[in-house]
């Protein structure tokens, strides 16, 4: 799951055997399979699953991307389905060239339709208008976007995926220079159901889908390709489903 280049895996297996494949590591240019979240609709249940505390991050309504900065300075943007979309978001490429510190890096974030003049998030349908192969310049004018970053998986030769979440978050904060179109996701440490409910309400008020509640314990490594209980989504539609049943 840390290397999606089947050709590289195959050639490594032929030349070095299974032991060599097991030594493959995260590196820019080879997309990492995204860590995924479970979902629940009750704050107390979420906290119980996460050991009583968590980081409640805003769940933005946009396109999740994995951004790779290569050694030559090139920026690649990949979707969670391993589709490269760099040419569709040249403005995101530029803000990363300007605001990302490490010379080589892999980070994850959400590309969101965003009005910097009013500091307002726009609906998901607007950012999807950017998913085109033609008319890119006009699309950038019609639908400006921002990148809200939530993970740093690699920086200047160091694989960060095995670090606990709080350490990755701190490294991410140090790796970017925030600006109008490049920011960290909003996150709040919570330890009580009422506080988690309040964070959820604020996220919705601010135009987000809800929260991604992340374990901040010592074993909160980035689990590439896994849908485990280290991350749990709390979204408006989940609560609506609960109230309707």
What positions do the PLM features span?
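Flexible, glycine/threonine-enriched loop-and-boundary segments that flank and lead into catalytic domains
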Residues: 35-56, 60, 193-199, 215-245
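Electropositive nucleic-acid-contacting surfaces
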Residues: 2-7, 84-85, 90-94, 200, ...
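N-terminal nucleic-acid-engaging modules of covalent nucleotidyltransferase systems
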Residues: 1-192
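A short, structural micro-pattern
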Residues: 103-106, 141-146, 205-207, 226-228, ...
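Metal-assisted phosphate- and nucleotidyl-transfer catalytic regions
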Residues: 174-224
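Short, charged low-complexity intrinsically disordered segments located at boundaries
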Residues: 14, 121-127, 197-208, 229-235
């Amino acid at each position: 799951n840390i290397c999606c280049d089947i050709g590289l895996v195959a050639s490594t297996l032929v030349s070095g055997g299974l032991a060599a494949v097991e030594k493959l590591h995260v590196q820019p240019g080879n997309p990492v399979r995204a860590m995924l979240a479970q979902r629940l609709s009750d704050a107390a249940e979420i906290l119980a699953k996460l050991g009583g505390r968590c980081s409640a991050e805003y769940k933005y309504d946009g396109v999740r991307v994995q951004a790779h900065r290569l050694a030559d300075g090139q920026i690649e943007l990949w979707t969670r389905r391993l589709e490269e979309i760099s040419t569709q978001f040249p403005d995101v490429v530029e803000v990363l060239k300007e605001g990302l510190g490490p010379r080589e890096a892999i980070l994850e974030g959400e590309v969101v339709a965003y009005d910097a003049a009013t500091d307002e998030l726009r609906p998901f349908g607007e950012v999807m208008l950017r998913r085109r192969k033609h008319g890119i310049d006009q699309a950038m004018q019609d639908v400006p976007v921002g990148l809200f970053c939530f993970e740093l998986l690699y920086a200047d030769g160091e694989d960060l995926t095995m670090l606990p979440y709080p350490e990755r978050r701190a490294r991410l904060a140090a790796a970017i220079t925030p600006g109008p179109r490049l920011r960290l996701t909003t996150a709040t440490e919570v330890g009580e159901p009422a506080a988690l409910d309040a964070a959820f309400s604020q996220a919705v008020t601010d135009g987000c889908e809800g929260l991604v509640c992340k374990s901040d314990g010592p074993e909160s490594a980035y689990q590439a390709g896994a849908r485990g209980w280290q991350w749990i989504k709390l979204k408006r539609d989940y609560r609506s489903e609960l109230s309707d049943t």
